[in-house]
């Protein structure tokens, strides 16, 4: 009985939350519609840059094309 009441309250809360946030979503719809080449400063996106480690730092399991190393070559430490 308690679980049923909790589930009903949770569903009502999530439904109300959806309706409350729906108005604010309409104001932001243009932000996601733009392609990266249409944006003013698409090069400044943090997703365009990877945080790589310089030569001599620990990189983990050794293998070629390791994204952790700037040189993409890992032998427990990044090598050039």
Curated annotation (Swiss-Prot):
Its main location: secreted. InterPro entries: Conotoxin, Conotoxin_omega-typ_CS. Belongs to the conotoxin O1 superfamily. Pfam families: Conotoxin. SUPFAM superfamilies: omega toxin-like. This is Omega-conotoxin-like PuIA. It comes from the Eukaryota. One of its GO terms (cellular component) is extracellular region. GO terms for molecular function: calcium channel regulator activity; ion channel inhibitor activity; toxin activity. It is found in: Secreted. Keywords: Calcium channel impairing toxin, Disulfide bond, Ion channel impairing toxin, Knottin, Neurotoxin, Presynaptic neurotoxin, Secreted, Signal, Toxin, Voltage-gated calcium channel impairing toxin.
């Amino acid at each position: 009985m308690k679980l049923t009441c909790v589930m009903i309250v949770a569903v009502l809360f999530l439904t109300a939350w959806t309706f409350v946030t729906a108005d604010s979503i309409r104001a932001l719809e243009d932000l996601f519609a733009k392609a990266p080449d249409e944006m003013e400063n698409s090069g400044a996106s943090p997703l365009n840059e990877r945080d790589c480690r310089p030569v001599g730092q620990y990189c983990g399991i050794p293998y070629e094309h390791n994204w952790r190393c700037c040189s993409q070559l890992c032998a427990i430490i990044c090598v050039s």
